């Protein structure tokens, strides 16, 4: 949501940003994502196979929260913009900073480190603060830490990293080189899992237009 960034107001780069363009870009990306799922469901239906119905969970982050913050700071915007503008039909939508526990693993855009609400800065600290397996985004690089609880069960804290195909203007040449990809969790059992990173370069090589 670059148009609502309070950090860039007054900068030359802020010129030309529009809320409607931000929403349209996000909704178009979501449409592309959902089309892949619907295409697979249609394929299975034609072959009379069990339909794949994944549980879809969307944890609102600080960029989506800019919408609510803008309305809160300027009452004239009430009714003109809201998170309802985002095309999230079919998703379970979690409010900003509200965790959700699935199979013993806590997920949130980020986890706070204390009463001030600042984000936990690394995976090891996340385990120390929350004492359970946790997965979060927010930061620009991946990080992972492991521990065991008093019962001897494994705990994993994961910073998922980014999923970009491009360089971001707000990052520098070093941070733009961060690992980009997604994660698959296998053998999930009450907070324990085997994590499998899948890089963007691997996905593009296997499923891209030139593969």
Model-predicted regions and their roles:
Residues 40-53, 66, 70-145, 149-151:
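Charged, low-complexity C-terminal accessory regions
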Residues 108-200:
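Conserved beta-sheet core of the metallophosphoesterase superfamily
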Residues 200-210:
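Polar, enzyme-active/binding microenvironments
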Residues 1-88:
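Core catalytic region of metal-dependent phosphoesterases/phosphodiesterases
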Residues 2-12, 17, 31, 35, ...:
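Feature recognizes metal-dependent phosphohydrolase scaffolds
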Residues 1-4, 85-99, 187, 191, ...:
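Short secondary-structure boundary segments
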């Amino acid at each position: 949501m670059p148009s609502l960034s309070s950090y860039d107001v007054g900068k030359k780069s802020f010129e030309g940003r529009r809320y409607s363009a931000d929403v349209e870009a996000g909704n178009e990306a979501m449409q592309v994502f959902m089309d892949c799922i619907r295409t697979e469901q249609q394929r299975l239906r034609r072959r009379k196979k069990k339909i794949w119905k994944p549980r879809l969970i969307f944890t609102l982050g600080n960029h989506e929260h800019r919408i609510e913050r803008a309305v809160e700071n300027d009452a004239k915007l009430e009714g003109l913009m809201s998170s309802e503008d985002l095309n999230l039909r079919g998703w379970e939508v979690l409010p900003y900073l509200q965790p959700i526990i699935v199979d013993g693993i806590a997920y949130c855009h980020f986890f706070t480190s204390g009463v001030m609400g600042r984000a936990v800065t690394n995976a090891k600290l996340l385990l120390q603060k929350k004492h359970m397996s946790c997965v979060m985004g927010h930061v620009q690089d991946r990080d992972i830490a492991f521990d065991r609880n008093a019962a001897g069960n494994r705990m994993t804290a994961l910073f998922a990293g980014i999923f970009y195909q491009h360089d971001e203007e707000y990052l520098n040449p070093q941070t733009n080189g961060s690992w980009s990809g997604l994660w698959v969790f296998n053998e999930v059992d009450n907070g324990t899992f085997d994590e499998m990173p899948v890089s963007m370069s691997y996905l593009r090589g296997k499923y891209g237009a030139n593969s």
